[in-house]
């Protein structure tokens, strides 16, 4: 058994696709119209086998969960990077709002930013 796909709820699929591709650097894999929404997935660098779906957050329970996680400063996902300081500088230069600057946390150094679509995302670099 392996993980092939996971989802993030987003408040605007077009804005999310731009952010995850143009700012974070992921690659669009699928963008298929499905009724009033779209099936959008992106992949990370060198990881065509693992997809992140940018799901429309139209479910009231999903919205409540997303808002509660954001309000409590809890990241909804974590992405590993090779050089967290370089990524912090690069993303800050692109206007990304960090809620936590890089800091050591045991076996990793981590930082947290807003994805502009209702989620907090953690970046981490193994120490």
For the regions a protein language model found, what residue spans apply to each?
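Conserved active-site tyrosine of GNAT-family acetyltransferases
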Residues: 16-21, 91, 118
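Vicinal oxygen chelate
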Residues: 1-5, 27-80, 86-114, 124-127
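Short Gly/charged-rich anion-binding patches and loops
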Residues: 15-16, 86
């Amino acid at each position: 058994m392996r993980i092939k796909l996971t989802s993030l709820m987003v408040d605007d699929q077009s804005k999310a696709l731009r952010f995850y591709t143009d700012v974070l650097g992921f690659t669009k894999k699928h963008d298929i119209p499905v009724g009033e929404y779209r099936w959008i997935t992106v992949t990370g660098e060198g990881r065509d086998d693992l997809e992140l779906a940018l799901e429309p957050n139209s479910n009231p329970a999903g919205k409540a969960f997303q808002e509660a996680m954001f309000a409590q400063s809890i990241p909804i996902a974590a992405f590993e990077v090779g050089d967290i300081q370089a990524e912090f500088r690069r993303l800050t230069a692109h206007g990304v709002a960090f809620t936590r600057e890089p800091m050591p946390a045991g076996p990793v150094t981590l930082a947290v930013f807003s994805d502009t679509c209702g989620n907090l995302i953690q970046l981490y670099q193994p120490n």
